[in-house]
């Protein structure tokens, strides 16, 4: 009889130890899973906004490059019309972009000749979740302009280039990821389109 009681006591103690071990394992694994979930939330949001920036830049450049065959001019090759196309594309994401006009085009930090990223930190908006738009017009002779207030009335821009660049200060929302990357990360996308026209 004493042997049976002794076995029962040992089994009960063993079960209590197992429960404590399971609790520790769950605490460690749930912490790791929670950190992964927070990272996925911010990564998913960043991907969502980068896809919206990409689409808006493409839509703005395509809209500006369009050629009216009957009128023989580019009716949307100006700042206001391109910005309207960009903001219509970004409306679904709940963002409104701001046009930044400059005397010249946005100069990348690696000085590449086509105006692609990376861009200087000063070009990004200071406010979180804000978008700056830079439009660069290159005429057929290679002259670059940072602004075009009104569209051309003829076919002079044919085979030129319009480059629409969108730069965003993306706000991270999970505290742990903010601790790693800071308050936000810079997202940028630009799109070139050849300005259409007929000789």
Stretches found by the model and what they are:
Residues 1-19:
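N-terminal leader/signal peptides at the extreme start of proteins
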Residues 2-7, 58-199:
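Short, conserved structural patches
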Residues 7, 14, 31, 40-44, ...:
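A general structural-boundary detector
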Residues 17, 21-29, 34-71:
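Aliphatic-rich helix starts adjacent to a transmembrane/signal segment
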């Amino acid at each position: 009889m004493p042997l049976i009681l002794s076995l029962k006591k040992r089994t009960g103690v063993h079960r209590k130890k197992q429960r404590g071990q399971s609790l520790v394992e769950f605490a460690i694994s749930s912490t790791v899973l929670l950190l992964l979930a927070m990272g996925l939330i911010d990564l998913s949001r960043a991907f969502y906004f980068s896809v919206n920036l990409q689409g808006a830049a493409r839509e703005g450049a395509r809209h500006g490059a369009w050629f009216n065959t009957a009128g023989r001019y580019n009716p949307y090759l100006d700042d206001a019309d391109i910005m309207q196309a960009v903001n219509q594309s970004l409306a679904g994401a709940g963002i409104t972009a701001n046009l930044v006009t400059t005397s010249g085009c946005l100069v990348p930090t690696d000085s590449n000749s086509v105006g692609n990223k990376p861009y200087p930190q000063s070009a990004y908006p200071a406010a979180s979740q804000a978008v700056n738009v830079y439009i660069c017009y290159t005429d057929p002779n290679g002259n670059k302009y940072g602004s075009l207030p009104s569209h051309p009335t003829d076919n002079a821009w044919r085979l030129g280039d319009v480059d629409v660049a969108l730069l965003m200060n993306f706000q991270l929302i999970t505290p742990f990821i903010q601790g790693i990357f800071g308050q936000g990360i810079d997202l940028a996308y630009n799109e070139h389109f050849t300005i259409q026209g007929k000789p």
